[in-house]
Amino acid sequence: MTGGANGIGRCITEYFASEGDTVYILDKEAKQTVLVVNEMQHKGWNVIGCFGDIADKQTLLDFAGQVLSEHPEGIHCIINNACLMQGGVLDSCEYEDFLYVQRVGVAAPFMLAKLFKDHFVGLGSIVNISSTRAFQSQPNTESYTAAKGGITALTHALAVSLSGIARVNSIAPGWIETGTHQEAAFAPSNESDYLQHPSQRVGNSDDIARAVVFLCDERNSFINGENITIDGGMSKLMIYHNDCGWEYKAR
């Protein structure tokens, strides 16, 4: 589990750990990871915290080495959750900033699949956390949007390459309200933020975690290479100026 110390990643970790699974968290925030791991271990859950920047290849090599040395029998699932925003073409996002986001959001998931592909127990499962930003955009989000488009395409590519080894699927969250992970640019502040969604609410981490557990369940092994959008129907809503109460305001 990458990015397992906060937000959606933490929630996913809790779902698996509470069912008795051993979960390895790889997160850049060492202090938060220690806090989360201690809380979960206090509940009797088997959660192990690992620290490092997944943009660094050596971090991934060390992580895989630790997991496999402690569990030589192999693993069952990989959850690629970690990513970050570094802005886009309208602000101070530079070439190196853009590439850094791609290393975290696309290159690291590729490398983890490569490192673990020979070590799955039975038919494994890889779930990549994408975003509705892979398919629609707001201004100045190029670094993050490109990474989420990349992880979505990587999903179906890996599904084909890892046939018989692991199923690979992705989830594209919409507006998810957590302490640290929001696809929207701001927290919901009024009733309209909720009611604009066909589901008339914003999402929460549990909505995503339940879908991840579903995709990792071997009973659902015919689902492969797919992206599941979880956004309360928002991306299906046709929006035009002065239509159904929508109004365009020029920037």
Residue spans for each PLM region:
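Alpha-helical segment proximal to the catalytic Tyr-Lys
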Residues: 118, 159-164, 221
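Canonical Rossmann dinucleotide-binding motif of NAD(H)/NADP(H)-dependent dehydrogenases/reductases
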Residues: 1-24
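Substrate-binding pocket helix/loop in short-chain dehydrogenase/reductase
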Residues: 89-90, 94-99, 193
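Active-site helix of classical SDR
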Residues: 113, 147, 155
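Short C-terminal tail/terminal secondary-structure segment
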Residues: 136, 213, 224-251
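C-terminal helical subdomain
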Residues: 170, 191-223, 230-232
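Residue(s) in the substrate-gating loop at a strand-loop-helix junction
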Residues: 131
